[in-house]
Curated annotation (Swiss-Prot):
Pfam families: Cytochrom_C (PF00034). It comes from Azotobacter vinelandii. PROSITE patterns: CYTC (PS51007). The keyword Iron applies. Binds 1 heme c group covalently per subunit. InterPro entries: Cyt_c-like_dom, Cyt_c-like_dom_sf, Cyt_c_ID. Heme c binds at C12, C15, H16, M61. GO terms for molecular function: electron transfer activity; heme binding; iron ion binding. It comes from the Bacteria. This is Cytochrome c-551. Keywords: Electron transport, Heme, Iron, Metal-binding, Transport. Signal peptide: none annotated. The keyword Iron applies.
Length: 82
């Protein structure tokens, strides 16, 4: 599956949009915040899989039922939005 397909089928759309903040940050905000950081796709993939909090406000992102490969595909796709 492509990143866009995973975004649509894995529940990401409930909290995230490409260019506007919903519950979580927009993908354009994520890309702007982390642009140029080495290894950021791996870091984001780990957050997608395990969940996390504290980076974008009080509401935590829950762990997501994705494989490591799916999480990496999603992270790489998220980071294409500028």
């Amino acid at each position: 599956e492509t990143g866009e397909e995973l975004y649509k089928t894995k529940g990401c759309t409930v909290c995230h949009a490409i260019d506007s903040k919903l519950v979580g940050p927009s993908f354009k905000e994520v890309t702007a915040k982390y642009a140029g950081q080495a290894g950021i796709a791996d870091t984001l993939a780990a957050k997608i899989k395990a969940g996390g909090s504290g980076n974008w406000g009080q509401i935590p992102m829950p762990p997501n039922p994705v494989s490591e490969a799916e999480a990496k595909t999603l992270a790489e796709w998220v980071l294409t939005h500028k």
